[in-house]
């Protein structure tokens, strides 16, 4: 918890909201989203129906995004993650850690875990 407060740049033991959501596609789990949110930027976060909207969409409306940071890592998932994502054996995950800024401060930090066999990342950029 102290590390998380430090990541947000707030005092240790400050309140943070937390949500854990498993996202499905064609009845298969494809993402485990664990998100922490700064309450003063999204005070109604814990009352939102995330069956109707995503945390990202909600946060984009109440605390418009100014900056986003992505960190990608290949990791071996913990047992809990493996079960929630219906993963087999020693399959690795792609872990994306996303920090989002709004109103000059970090609004949320999300840990997004994707089963290695069910996720592909691609991009196309122009210089």
What are these model-derived regions, one by one?
Residues 1-127:
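C-terminal all-alpha effector/ligand-binding and dimerization domain
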């Amino acid at each position: 918890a102290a590390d998380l407060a430090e990541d947000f740049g707030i005092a240790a033991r400050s309140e943070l909201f937390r949500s854990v959501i498993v996202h499905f596609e064609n009845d298969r789990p494809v993402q485990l989203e664990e998100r922490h949110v700064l309450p003063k930027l999204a005070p109604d976060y814990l009352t939102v129906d995330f069956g109707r909207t995503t945390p990202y969409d909600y946060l984009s409306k109440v605390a418009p995004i100014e900056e986003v940071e992505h960190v990608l890592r290949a990791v071996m998932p913990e047992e809990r993650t493996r079960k929630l994502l219906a993963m087999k054996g020693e399959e690795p995950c792609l872990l994306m850690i996303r920090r989002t800024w709004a109103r000059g401060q970090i609004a949320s930090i999300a840990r997004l875990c994707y089963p290695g066999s069910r996720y592909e990342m691609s991009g196309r950029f122009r210089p």
